[in-house]
């Protein structure tokens, strides 16, 4: 016999077991169930970064550049992945940059290496870029405060990766 929805929900709620919660290190969280929503503590990436190998430039310095009309810039530094530069790019300058490296002050675009040639510190540009080209902006993957996982989520390896990348060391889970 069918019963009204309110009565059915009341019966189900009466049978619910309230589970205890514990806070554990994330290294012990595999195959557990989250007892809280997980929100990001920080932006990812935490800075504007280069989306490819190339040259951090002021886009305006490249306007009009083509295979038939090269523009010329002076190389002032190199930023490898995991490094950063204290230098600020001014008009007429460029910094060689690796994929994933933070965009230096003053730059507003990254010119792909394929559209350049250089000898020593002299850089010839064979193509133009627009502002923001080839830059992954701060928070592109994840913004501070974004919900990453819902409470009651079963924690597998991929969830652990998200939790760790969000900056968590400990989380609340339901006791076994």
Where are these regions (language model features)?
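Short, low-complexity N-terminal leaders and the immediately following helix N-cap/first helix
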Residues: 1-69
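Short, glycine/charged-enriched hinge/interface segments at domain edges or termini
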Residues: 56-176
